[in-house]
């Protein structure tokens, strides 16, 4: 991992620290109608259980603002104290003023400089939110999106650019406008009295190369904690790959303190998918460990049986299910490496390199499956119960290696 290009401030959001030398934080956002307390609480609990360390909720009208304190109370009944971020557009100043209990209950406010107010009202309405944040000792994310960019600012920069001897391209102007909007807003917030360690900024776009270019420049120009993410990543494989590529490159360069993957969920798909992708990005970069990793081969002509795929799925599902209790009982188990391989070519080698691994027989190979523990052959499995026996061996390994001595 690359070193941080600039040392960022540390921002406390509820019980979570963002920035500085702290681990990159995983965020998510609900898609429920916030005023529906029951559904919103249910989704927040699911997101938090999946590993989201901060959850953002839409606060777009009076019903939503009035529901926020009740949502926090209901979460507490489930022993869930995940910080909630209020997502405000257009009317945040009004809602936070009219519903002071909402302002108190939220752990952070998100403001979009592009729609916090227009014309002469912009600075006034922005200032109202900042003053409420100061009064309640709350941090603020100044989140700029290129889909809702401040048009007055953009027009100003275009006019200035047109007067230059060597004008920038329209794309470069867009990048400059995003960064300028964020930094000018952050500077104004500080002038109003909001401390630097209460400010997080983001400049979100939808294209990978644009995101990389904007954040590389942004990281050089400021010391604020940075929130990373494509503003709309898309659905399925496209959204996952675009997010992994863009966030992976920036994080590897040491840019970014908290991330969200804005996937479009497939119909009836769980909202928690975006959390899983965030965690996989961080774990595969070696920045954090959340759950034991499973190395498995893709299969080839040597592995005509589907059994190794079935076993891989069973092992992964078992590990994911058990981690909710294991992480409390067995310190360090999240770093465990498991291998499930399908033939003799790479099977023994990968299994030896894992903490615990199994090499299943490929086509035409002897119908036995050696199990390796800490690099040494420990068992040989055969017959119809290989799956159950291997999972039992994994269970015993966890207890023996990670249990309290």
Swiss-Prot record:
One of its GO terms (biological process) is isopentenyl diphosphate biosynthetic process, methylerythritol 4-phosphate pathway. The keyword Flavoprotein does not apply. It holds the Pfam family GcpE. It comes from the Bacteria. Its EC number is 1.17.7.3. Pathway: Isoprenoid biosynthesis; isopentenyl diphosphate biosynthesis via DXP pathway; isopentenyl diphosphate from 1-deoxy-D-xylulose 5-phosphate: step 5/6. Gene3D superfamilies: Dihydropteroate synthase-like, Sulfite Reductase Hemoprotein, domain 1. One of its GO terms (molecular function) is iron ion binding. Its cofactor is [4Fe-4S] cluster. Belongs to the IspG family. This is 4-hydroxy-3-methylbut-2-en-1-yl diphosphate synthase (flavodoxin).
């Amino acid at each position: 991992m690359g070193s941080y290009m600039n040392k960022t401030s540390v921002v406390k959001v509820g019980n979570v620290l963002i920035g500085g030398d702290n681990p990159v934080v995983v965020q998510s956002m609900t898609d429920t109608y916030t005023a529906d307390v029951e559904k919103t609480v249910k989704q927040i609990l699911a997101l938090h259980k999946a590993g989201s360390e901060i959850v953002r909720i839409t606060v777009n009208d009076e019903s939503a603002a009035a529901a926020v304190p009740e949502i926090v109370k209901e979460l507490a009944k489930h022993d869930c104290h995940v910080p909630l971020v209020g997502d405000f557009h257009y009317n945040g100043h009004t809602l936070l003023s009219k519903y002071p209990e909402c302002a108190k209950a939220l752990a952070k406010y998100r403001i979009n400089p592009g729609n916090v107010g227009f014309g002469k009202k912009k600075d006034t309405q922005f200032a109202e939110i900042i003053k409420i944040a100061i009064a309640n000792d709350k941090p603020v994310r100044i989140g700029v999106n290129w889909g809702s960019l401040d048009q007055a600012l953009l027009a100003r920069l275009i006019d200035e650019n047109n007067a230059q001897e060597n004008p920038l391209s329209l794309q470069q102007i867009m990048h400059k406008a995003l960064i300028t909007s964020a930094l000018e807003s952050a500077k104004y917030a500080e002038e109003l009295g909001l401390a630097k360690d209460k400010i997080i900024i983001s400049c979100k776009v939808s294209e990978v190369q644009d995101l990389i270019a904007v954040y590389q420049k942004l990281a050089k120009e400021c010391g604020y904690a940075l929130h990373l993410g494509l503003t709309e990543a898309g659905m399925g494989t496209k959204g996952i790959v675009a997010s992994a590529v863009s966030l992976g490159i920036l994080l590897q360069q040491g840019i970014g303190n908290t991330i969200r993957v804005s996937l479009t969920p497939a119909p009836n798909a769980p909202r928690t998918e975006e959390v899983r992708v965030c965690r996989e990005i961080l774990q595969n970069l070696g920045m954090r460990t959340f759950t034991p990793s499973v190395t498995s081969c893709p299969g080839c002509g040597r592995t005509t049986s589907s059994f190794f795929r079935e076993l891989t799925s069973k092992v992964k599902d078992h590990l994911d299910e058990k981690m909710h209790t294991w992480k409390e009982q067995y310190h360090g188990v999240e770093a465990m490496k498991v291998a499930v391989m399908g033939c003799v070519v790479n099977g023994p080698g990968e299994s030896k390199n894992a903490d615990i691994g199994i090499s299943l027989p490929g086509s035409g190979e002897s119908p036995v499956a050696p199990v390796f523990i800490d690099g040494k052959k420990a068992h040989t499995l055969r017959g119809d119960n290989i799956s159950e026996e291997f999972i039992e061996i994994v269970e015993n390994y966890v207890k023996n290696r990670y249990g309290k001595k």
